[in-house]
């Protein structure tokens, strides 16, 4: 018996197939969110809905189709004697999270109230339904869509908060989820604060000469030797680090063109830890 967990992001949709008997993740897959063709960020997609009659239906069907394709990829990646269609029959639960705009579009809810202050949620509570109600080819699965918090702080931040227990600590704890839309949660057992801000353009190319989206060939991990200052890195689409013999073969067909958001954050941290820049970000 399997379950599926999916983070429906503005740029990337990430999914995990879980053995419900053991709790083990047995397959994972990711895909670009095809809604990008309607708008690179959340507000441009909301604008598309406002300016195009039926635009919300287009965006809803697009993300649901992408989600069903991702589930197919998970079934294909599972190491089992079952055929992919048979694996679908053994999936009994699916949990979906995402920012409020993606949450509303996935559920077929008008996102336009989120397009201007006070950024009102039409539905913020958890939603339970049959997976088939979301046009997913999972005939025996129940679907749980996580609760949104408020404004543009969504179910993805709520699930991360529960996992990290930011809301249940004695000492203040800060949880940061940096995607196309960044969400920050600061909390203790007594009180929790949450906020969000668009960050995608800053980490995916805008004003960064070597910035790019998290696609095949993007540098995603960076380490700097604290003694020699020699860097090494990993790219999306290859398992080996740049200083390992297998790297050249694994990246032969990849166009290594820049750094995605995770690499930009890591290189700043590595520069600081190596003493190559100070706490103000000034390179020594």
Regions found by a protein language model. Name each.
Residues 1-5, 10, 22, 59-88, ...:
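Nucleotide/phosphate-binding catalytic cleft detector across ATP-hydrolyzing
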Residues 2, 12, 16, 280-284:
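Non-catalytic terminal/interface segments that mediate subunit docking, oligomerization
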Residues 10, 15-17, 23-43, 113-126, ...:
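Glycine-rich phosphate-binding loop of actin/hexokinase-like ATP-binding domains
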Residues 37-38, 82, 111, 283:
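Residue-level detector of alpha-helical recognition elements and their boundaries
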Residues 41-56, 136-145, 248:
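Gly-rich Lys/Arg/Thr-decorated short loops/hinges at beta-loop-alpha junctions or inter-strand turns
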Residues 53-75, 79, 92, 239-265, ...:
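N-terminal leader/propeptide and maturation segments of large enzyme subunits in energy/redox metabolism
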């Amino acid at each position: 018996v399997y379950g599926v967990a999916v983070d429906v992001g503005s740029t990337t949709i990430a999914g995990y197939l879980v053995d419900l008997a053991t709790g083990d993740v047995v397959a994972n897959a990711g895909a670009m969110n095809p809604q990008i063709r309607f708008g690179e960020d959340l507000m441009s997609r909301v604008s598309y809905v406002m300016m195009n009659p039926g635009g919300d239906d287009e965006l809803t069907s697009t993300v649901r189709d992408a989600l069903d394709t991702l589930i197919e990829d998970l079934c294909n990646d599972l190491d089992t004697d079952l055929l992919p269609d048979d694996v679908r029959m053994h999936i009994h639960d699916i949990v979906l999270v995402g920012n409020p705009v993606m949450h509303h579009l996935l559920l077929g809810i008008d996102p336009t109230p989120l397009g201007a202050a006070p950024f009102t949620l039409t539905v913020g509570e958890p939603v339970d339904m049959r997976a088939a109600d979301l046009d997913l080819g999972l005939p025996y699965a129940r679907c749980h869509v996580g609760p949104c918090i408020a404004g543009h702080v969504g179910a993805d931040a709520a699930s991360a908060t529960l996992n990290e227990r930011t809301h249940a600590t004695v000492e203040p704890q800060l949880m940061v989820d940096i995607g196309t839309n960044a969400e920050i949660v600061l909390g203790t057992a007594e009180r929790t604060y949450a906020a969000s801000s668009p960050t995608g353009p800053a980490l995916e190319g805008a004003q960064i000469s070597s910035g790019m989206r998290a696609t095949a060939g993007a540098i995603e991990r960076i380490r700097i030797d604290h003694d020699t200052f020699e860097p090494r890195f990993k790219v999306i689409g290859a398992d080996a680090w740049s200083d390992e013999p297998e790297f050249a073969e694994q990246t032969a067909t990849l166009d290594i063109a820049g750094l995605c958001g995770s690499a930009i954050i890591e290189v700043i941290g590595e520069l600081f830890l190596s003493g190559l820049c100070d706490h103000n970000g000034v390179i020594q």
